[in-house]
Amino acid sequence: MHVSTLLVAVLLPLALSKPTPRKKTSSFKVHLARRGETEYYRDGPTDLQRAYAKYGIPTTHEMEGYHPQPISKLPGNSKATAGSGKEGVESQDEKGEVVNNPTDHDIQFLSPVTIGGQPFIMNFDTGSSDTWVMNTQMTDEEAKKDHHLYDPSKSKTASKLVDQNFDIKYGDKTHASGPVYSDVMDIGGATVRNQAIGLPSKVAASLAEDKTSDGLVGLAMTKLNTIRPVKQKTFFENLAEDLDEPVFTAQLRHGKMGSYEFGAIDKSKYHGDLIKVPVINENGFWEIPCSLYSVGKLDKIQTIQNGTGTAILDTGTTLLVLDEKIVKAYYAQVPGARYDPTRFAGWVYPCNSPMPSLFLAVGTDHMAIIPSSLLTFQSYGPGPDGVETCYGGLQSNNAGGIQILGDVFFKALFVVFDQRGPSISLAPHA
């Protein structure tokens, strides 16, 4: 098979609410400052367990015995803060942009959001369609600690949506549920006046323990929205008709500041040409064909055999979660790699082992390279044998029938989400 090297750096082609009317003449870049003097992180097995829960993937017997680690304090300097929302504001034009901040190990890319004039740091999630925020009406006082809390009584623009409730479940254990309010929501200068926002009266402990984030902005399709009895549009869907282009882009880079941008595609943020891929949106996800892979070399392209054939682009998931066939083929090329069913309930390897790159199909005509440098999630230090152990950024979907292109994928590629079609487009980061 002849393979062009036109985009060899990362992409390789193979043979219901109303948004605020806005002028399309200005935008704002919002730089993050610090969020206090504490910093938090998750561990790899916990993130994998949460990914399984989010998509209802059955856990392994070993994972059922693995207890998610509480969010732990670490020394360091990659901290996020919710300030006034105006710090470091830089006026530009014809687009709305918000700069995100990676937390430890790039587990989340967090961004400043203003709701009813109140500032928060939130996680943008292209794998769900509900927007919800920690708030003063939560019944669990412990869950409120160390979060910025939305108070509808302090907003002049808030109104409760009568008899409307949301209940988003990420598997059996992780959830958020409660009443729904409408309020003005601003992200990087892009504003929706009557955005539906869930105010959970209770949240799962794993969500409350994540002190880096005050909530979630869902950016998948309305079909996934859990508000009842009437589904509500996402922030992006409300905003799209007032944008120059109905798009938003994700620039999530390893260990660096990145950005989400609404209404325009900044050509300075990527190399080469964008590769456009139609989205399979029947399930409400940003889902694309993904049925080919190769480990290390493009001359050994293999077809995924178990019939999954698609993958979901999800900024709310940390890891790359793929069919077990791919994962086993990858780690077969990593000296000392093994599936550890006890301590890690996932794939680990000596940190000094050479790692191959991973090639994945994006659509039917192109392959994306995930560089080896992005495929280590974190180190756990020396094991009993004195060898430093690393947890892989690539993990198995446990035959769950769903493949998830999480932040490991986004760190390799600049991604455009386009409502027209819909479609996604990809290119190497600049």
From Swiss-Prot:
Q: Which domain of life is it from?
A: Eukaryota
Its Gene Ontology cellular component terms are: extracellular region
Location in or out of the cell: Secreted
UniProt EC number: 3.4.23.-
Annotated PROSITE patterns: ASP_PROTEASE (PS00141), PEPTIDASE_A1 (PS51767)
Annotated PANTHER family = ASPARTIC ENDOPEPTIDASE, PUTATIVE (AFU_ORTHOLOGUE AFUA_2G15950)-RELATED (PTHR47966:SF23), BETA-SITE APP-CLEAVING ENZYME, ISOFORM A-RELATED (PTHR47966)
Q: By what name is this protein known?
A: Probable aspartic-type endopeptidase TRV_06366
Q: Where is the organism placed in the taxonomic lineage, from the top? A: Eukaryota, Fungi, Dikarya, Ascomycota, Pezizomycotina
